[in-house]
Each structure stands twice: as structure tokens, then as C-alpha cells.
């Protein structure tokens, strides 16, 4: 337990330090050790300070990856997008575009829920493939798109099934009579 206190004390020392190089090296160290929460906390402070320096690209990419590795996919996608918009020809642009799409893919809900984020994920992955058609990650991106499209098809099926089930529901006589007169809306959903 002594190592834990030393570690916490060391982390607090890093947070309180005014030496940005020291903080950046500590953030890289935490990132390398898989301590993404600590890395992201430090990098959040540093990205504006490091803007315009040689460490700016790497710090923004590491911040995005820190959130990605913590499972905060929306924040990760935001920072990946910020990276590739700021550095369109940057060192990590291909990875940032790919991981932005993958982060949105991982954040999509189950088919019965609203699928707005699924459309965003498809769009982001298609943009990745447009910008990097020869990427070694192209096949993975295509598989994610197919998976997302399957999710949308399942959503449409569930919606159509719901309309069909409502149309054949016999508990409400006036509703059922109205459906017989006006027709079942099921076919309009297909």
C-alpha cells in the first residue's frame, strides 16, 4: 500500500506542477502504462498550452486515445475529429479518422432504440474510406459499416413488426374496425 500512496503523491505532484514539459512526460508515461484516466486529466490541461508546438499533434491524439481506451467514445470521437480537422495531413490523421468512426460504432445503441448515432458512425467510417481508400484498416471499416447497416435493417423490421402487431391487436374493437376499413399500415413500413 506504500507504493499506492507514492503513486498518488506523485500524480498529485504532477497535477500541481507548473512545468509543462514535466507534465507532458508524465502524461505520456501514464498513457504508456495504460493509466488513461490520469493521462487524460493531464492532457486536457495541456492541449491548449501545447497548441502550436511540436508536441501538439501527439498530445491531442493521446488525449483522444485515452478517452477511447476508457470507453468514453463520444468524447474520444470529438477529439479525434478535432485532431483530423486541425491536422489534415498530420502524423495520426489516418488513425484519428478510423478511430473516430470506430468510437461512434462502439457507441451505437441496440436496434430497438434511436439510431441517429448509427447514421453518424456510418458517415464517419465512409469518410475514412474515402480519405484512405488503400488503408490496411479498410476491411475492418467496411465490416463495421455492414454491421451498422444490418442494425438499421433490424430497426426497420422491428418498427414494421410493431405496426403489424398494432394492426392485428384485437383488444380495442374500434381500433381494429378502423384498421379493417383503412387498411393495415404494415405494408407502408416495408
Question: How does the language model describe each region?
Answer:
Residues 4-190:
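Acidic, polar-rich low-complexity tracts and alpha-helical solenoid repeat scaffolds
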Amino acid at each position: 500500500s506504500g507504493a499506492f500512496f507514492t503513486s498518488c503523491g506523485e500524480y498529485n505532484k504532477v497535477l500541481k506542477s507548473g512545468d509543462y514539459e514535466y507534465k507532458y512526460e508524465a502524461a505520456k508515461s501514464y498513457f504508456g502504462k495504460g493509466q488513461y484516466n490520469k493521462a487524460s486529466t493531464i492532457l486536457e490541461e495541456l492541449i491548449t498550452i501545447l497548441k502550436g508546438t511540436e508536441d501538439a499533434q501527439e498530445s491531442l491524439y493521446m488525449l483522444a486515445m485515452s478517452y477511447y481506451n476508457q470507453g468514453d467514445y463520444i468524447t474520444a470521437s470529438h477529439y479525434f475529429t478535432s485532431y483530423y480537422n486541425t491536422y489534415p495531413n498530420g502524423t495520426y490523421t489516418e488513425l484519428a479518422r478510423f478511430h473516430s468512426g470506430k468510437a461512434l460504432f462502439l457507441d451505437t445503441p441496440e436496434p430497438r432504440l434511436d439510431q441517429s448515432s448509427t447514421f453518424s458512425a456510418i458517415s464517419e467510417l465512409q469518410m475514412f474510406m474515402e480519405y484512405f481508400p488503400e488503408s490496411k484498416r479498410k476491411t475492418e471499416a467496411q465490416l463495421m459499416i455492414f454491421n451498422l447497416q444490418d442494425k438499421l435493417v433490424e430497426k426497420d423490421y422491428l418498427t414494421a413488426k410493431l405496426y403489424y402487431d398494432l394492426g392485428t391487436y384485437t383488444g380495442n374493437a374500434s381500433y381494429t374496425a378502423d384498421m379493417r376499413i383503412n387498411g393495415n399500415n404494415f405494408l407502408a413500413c416495408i
